[in-house]
């Protein structure tokens, strides 16, 4: 599994290089949902506070999910990658949010809403020398852009 091997390599690199290049990596406590299908964007636009159609692929998008009274029930970070949308959101709300999104799917819409909590991880790397760590993991720091996801 790519995420597990990347995480193991990240821990190894941080452990061996932390004296020379102090950085910190956090494995974020979050829930991850993958939405795919012909009508995925339609279902999300019906439920979220933004129109995700106005953003290009690989754009980093943030939005909210509100209940019928207008109260915020979850916050999302989106990654539109290939033919699927990855939602990173509150760890405690994962199952409830997926149920709510699923309830908003019409009988004639083609959408899969998948639990990816144990498949994908959200890792945050911080520190003055984080570019050195990224390079050792095979990521070219010059390819990183604010507001965009990078596949590697």
Task: Set out the residue ranges of the language-model regions.
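Basic, glycine/lysine-rich polyanion-binding surfaces/domains
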Residues: 2-152
């Amino acid at each position: 599994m790519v995420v597990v091997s990347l995480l193991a390599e990240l821990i190894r690199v941080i452990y061996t290089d932390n004296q020379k290049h102090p950085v910190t990596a956090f494995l974020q406590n979050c829930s991850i949902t993958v939405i795919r299908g012909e009508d995925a964007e339609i279902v999300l636009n019906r439920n979220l506070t933004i129109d995700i159609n106005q953003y290009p692929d690989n754009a980093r998008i943030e939005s909210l999910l509100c209940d019928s009274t207008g109260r915020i029930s979850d916050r999302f970070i989106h990654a539109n990658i290939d033919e699927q949308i990855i939602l990173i959101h509150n760890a405690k709300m994962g199952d409830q949010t997926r149920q709510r999104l699923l309830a908003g799917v019409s009988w004639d819409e083609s959408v899969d809403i998948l639990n990816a909590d144990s498949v994908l991880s959200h890792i945050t790397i911080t520190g003055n020398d984080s570019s050195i760590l990224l390079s050792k993991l095979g990521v070219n720091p010059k390819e990183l852009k604010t507001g965009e996801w990078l596949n590697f």
